[in-house]
A protein has these predicted regions:
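N-terminal Rossmann-like NAD(P)+-binding domain of SDR-like oxidoreductases, especially those catalyzing
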Residues: 1-162
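NAD(P)-dependent short-chain dehydrogenase/reductase
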Residues: 116-119, 129, 141-202
Length: 202
């Protein structure tokens, strides 16, 4: 958006352990970009809406690591469900007088659970198999309920695995590369027979 369109972009980020400021170096000094360190669970989020008057929201905020969700489910429940709820409430209140705003909620294919044959699509039944997937499924249902109940314009996308430059080393592709370079064992999930689609993000 910053490089190709004449938009002013506000990046709201909690800046957790997996954040990487290097990813914004190309445009961090741009007059069309503003970074706000902020937790979307904070009820003052609505103030940012009314101050900057956005036309669109891309909700990529989430705890996303499956293994960590097994060790600490509570963080995923708070950030992915409560965070989405607070975002939706802020969006709903702002949308009352600003009808042009739209929401794109980024979800995951993990909400469909194990796909034993073929592939999953957005019409499949949700069968989350980890606390992470369950928290994202819950946030999806919240978004859909606000779309139906309050008529907010929202789209839910269920993208597959992603990888790219500066990704946190706990993610699979960076972890595999690191382990290969350091002669460490490679992680195998299940029987190692699963296949996944990957999206390259630069």
């Amino acid at each position: 958006l910053l490089l190709q369109k004449n938009f002013f972009v506000i990046n709201i980020d909690k800046a957790t352990y997996s954040s990487n400021y290097y990813n914004t170096k190309e445009f961090k000094d741009s007059k069309k970009y503003k970074f706000i360190k902020f937790d979307i669970k904070n009820k003052n989020l609505k103030n940012i809406f009314f101050k900057y008057k956005p036309h669109g929201i891309f909700n990529l905020a989430a705890e996303t690591h499956v293994d960590r969700s097994i060790d600490s489910p509570k963080n995923f429940i708070k950030n992915n469900i409560v965070g989405t709820f607070n975002l939706l409430e802020s969006f709903r209140n702002y949308h009352i007088k600003n009808k042009n705003i739209k929401l794109i909620h980024i979800s995951t294919d993990e909400v469909f659970g194990d796909v034993l044959i073929g592939r999953s699509d957005e019409n499949d039944t949700y069968k989350p198999s980890s606390p992470y997937a369950a928290s994202k499924a819950s946030s999806d249902h919240l978004v859909y309920s606000y779309y139906r109940t309050f008529n907010i314009p929202a789209i839910i996308t269920n993208c597959s695995n992603n990888y790219g430059p500066n990704q946190h080393p706990e993610k699979l592709i960076p972890k595999l590369i690191y382990n290969i370079l350091h002669n460490l064992p490679l992680p195998i999930y299940g029987k190692g027979s699963n296949s996944r689609e990957w999206i390259y993000v630069k």
